[in-house]
């Protein structure tokens, strides 16, 4: 039972950190390449 409580307290924190860092990454990409439909480092 204690393990379940530990999981339920850790999972939201990790999820918040993950989505926060992902949002920050997307914001920075959109700041560097505004309105980009294709990114120059993905062109072949």
UniProtKB/Swiss-Prot annotation:
Keyword Coiled coil: no
Any Pfam family matching the protein: PSI_PsaJ
Keywords: Chloroplast, Membrane, Photosynthesis, Photosystem I, Plastid, Thylakoid, Transmembrane, Transmembrane helix
Membrane topology category: Single-pass membrane protein
GO CC annotations, alphabetized: chloroplast thylakoid membrane; photosystem I
Transmembrane residue ranges: 7-27
The keyword Cell membrane is annotated on this UniProt entry: no
GO biological process annotation, one example: photosynthesis
Family label: Belongs to the PsaJ family.
Name used for this protein in its record: Photosystem I reaction center subunit IX
Taxonomic source organism: Nymphaea alba (White water-lily)
Lineage of producing organism: Eukaryota, Viridiplantae, Streptophyta, Embryophyta, Tracheophyta
